Structures are given as C-alpha cells and as structure tokens.
C-alpha cells in the first residue's frame, strides 16, 4: 500500500468515523443511554477501530493486507450500512398517541422475581458444574485454543447456558439499583467470567460483556464520567490482550509484543479486515439466501433427536471459512454483520439488512423504555434484565452476523421466558400450599418501628 493510497483510505475512514461518532454523541446527549447508542459504539468498534491498527501493522511491520480498493469497499459499505440503519431507526412507524392504560401482558411480584433470578443462576451454575466434571480446567489441559472445538471436549452444548448468570445478576442489581449492588454485579459476574475462562479454555466473552454492562450502568446512573469510561476501555483492551496471551500460550517481548498486541487487539475488537477478505473473494461466493439462519438453529438440536445432524453447521461464518477460504483449521473466521449479509445475498442484502437491524434495535429500545415507565419495580427489573442481558446477542450480531444473532436471540428468549413461567408456576404451587404470606402495611409498619 502506497502512502497516497493510505491517505485516500484515511480520509474515507475519518469521514465515516466522524459521521457515526457525531450522530452517536447527539443521541448520547439526548438520552444518555439507549440501545441505539450501544449498537452505534459497537459498530464503530467493529468496523472502524481496527483501521489505525491495520495501518501500523502495514507500515511498521510490513504486514500484507487486502488491496486498497477492497479496503475502500469495506469502509464505504460500513458507512452506507450505518446511514440506512440510522434512517430506519429514526423513522417513526406510527403516530405517537397519548398513553392509554392497557391490560399488561404479564405482571411480576417479589417472590416471582426472586425465583426468576435464582432459576437463571441455577441454570448457569449447574451447566458449569456438569461441564467441569466432564472436562476439568481446559485452560491448563489443552495445548491449543482450537482444541476446545474438538471431540476431546464433551458437553460443548452446555456452554450456551453459562451466560444466563449475567441476566440473573442483572435482576439482583435492578431490584436495588444502588452503588453497592452495582459493584456486586461487577465482582460476581467478572469472577464467574474468570471461572468459565479457566474451565472452557480461554473464552473471554462473559468477562467482556460483564465489564461492558457494568460501565454502561455506571454511565446511566452518573457514577462514572466519559473520561473514566475511556480509561476503563483502555484497561479492558490491555486485560483482554493479557487473557489472549494466556489463551494461546504466548510469551512475547519487545517488537514482537507490540506486533502481537496490534493484531490480537484488532482481531478481538475490530475484525473489519475479515469483511475486506470476504469482499476480495466476492466472485467465489455462492449466495446462500436465508439458509444460514435456518442452519444456525441446528446446533440447538441434540444428536440423539436428529442422528443425521451435520457435524459442521454451515452458517455464514463456517461457509466463509471453509467454502470460500478453504480453511479447515477448526476455527471459524467471523464474517462480521455486513459480511454475513454478503454471504446471504451479496451487496443487495446490505441495505436490506440495515433496515432489519434498525427495526431490531428499535424493538429493544421500545422494551427498555417500557421498563423505564413501568411502575411495578419487579416487572421493570425483569424487563431491564432481559434488555441488558441481550447485549451479548448484539455483540454476536456485529461480529458474527445476522444468522448467528437470530438463533441466539431466539434461544435467549425461550430460556428466559421458560424461567419466568417456571417461577410463576412455583409461586402458584407455594401459594396453594400456604407457604407464601402476603406482606401487609401494618406488618411492614411494625417492622420499621421495631
């Protein structure tokens, strides 16, 4: 890449970054937090944060990258995607009408809410316990990270349930919403994330997500400033780099350490070059339509129920890795959100996907606002826990693609909804057995006076 070509790419990158950052800043000033702000920051991180890192790798370490025209296509496609997304998100689908009292779809009380978070936590802890009994601490047993996807590891499906520890702790926080509950959320979820990091053999997702949710809650409540957020972000990047070194068993120093930091940080937070690599192989793609979305549900079907289930699920990531790049290393290369749309339908699917994503984020913000307006604090805690718990799925959306997001968010909704139903059933059984006594104002007054 020549200096002139880099200058042209830099101008495009700068304009796109300023465009998205400016809109995000105005939205932040207006509401302080919503899921549009979160997704916008996530989009910036995924598609634009990596450009400076790539530039240093190219000019400092002479690393090969896709041709400049392909990199330009990647930057422009990301900028255009966000423009369509933003217009869709801001478009009002119906006229605003005065709030009319409606019969709520469901309601929650104190016992049901506490039962819900206990069940969610139980699912996570039991899954971790069973996985540990089968495999032990994989971080200290396996020689390479790719081995966690091999037949040596049993009970892989259980990993999908680990994440429900975070929504459980979110319910605990939203029931109190004070600084002690906020710090308890951080300590408990990060400790659980470190435990799963050692047991699974290097998966950092639970740690990243717990830390991100902690920071956003702090921003919402005014407990941390933007400067503190930036400092925490730098600390998070360094922490993720250290965990990556441990995961891959690397011992580096000097220039090699700087080089390793650049490419691991880029691959962890901003896999934008994967999109460029996919666009470089555009002519080799046999568009898959909506099949990757359907195929991604295969992983949730146990083999005993479907003996002929394919051993390799050909979602957009696996199709890109195996069929387009002919890479059979065992690790799937993340195609990113835009890349998954290209795999499904080419360039035409990019604006269509942007419209779909705009509606998805709009729906999450509607739920979030519903929780903000909800007078029943127990129901509000459940709604907020569901919304913030879905942050993991939004990260999957940006990094892995629309197909992976759809299957995971449906799984999340089903499990979360099942926990709610079980909690309500248990409450009904306990109440029928006379084990639950409703609090009265007189008893509460007596407790206060005592």
Swiss-Prot record:
Any one Pfam family match given in the protein's UniProt record, by short name: WzyE
Localization in the cell: Cell inner membrane
Keywords: Cell inner membrane, Cell membrane, Membrane, Transmembrane, Transmembrane helix
High-level lineage: Bacteria, Pseudomonadati, Pseudomonadota, Gammaproteobacteria, Enterobacterales
Biological function: Probably involved in the polymerization of enterobacterial common antigen (ECA) trisaccharide repeat units.
GO biological process annotation, one example: enterobacterial common antigen biosynthetic process
Keyword Transferase found: no
The protein's annotated pathway: Bacterial outer membrane biogenesis; enterobacterial common antigen biosynthesis
GO cellular component, one term: plasma membrane
Keyword Cell membrane: yes
Membrane topology: Multi-pass membrane protein
Segment forming the signal sequence: none
Transmembrane segments: 6-26, 37-57, 63-83, 118-138, 155-175, 181-201, 207-227, 228-248, 341-361, 378-398, 410-430
InterPro entries: WzyE
Entry similarity comment: Belongs to the WzyE family.
Predominant localisation class: membrane
Protein name: Probable ECA polymerase
Complex formation: Probably part of a complex composed of WzxE, WzyE and WzzE.
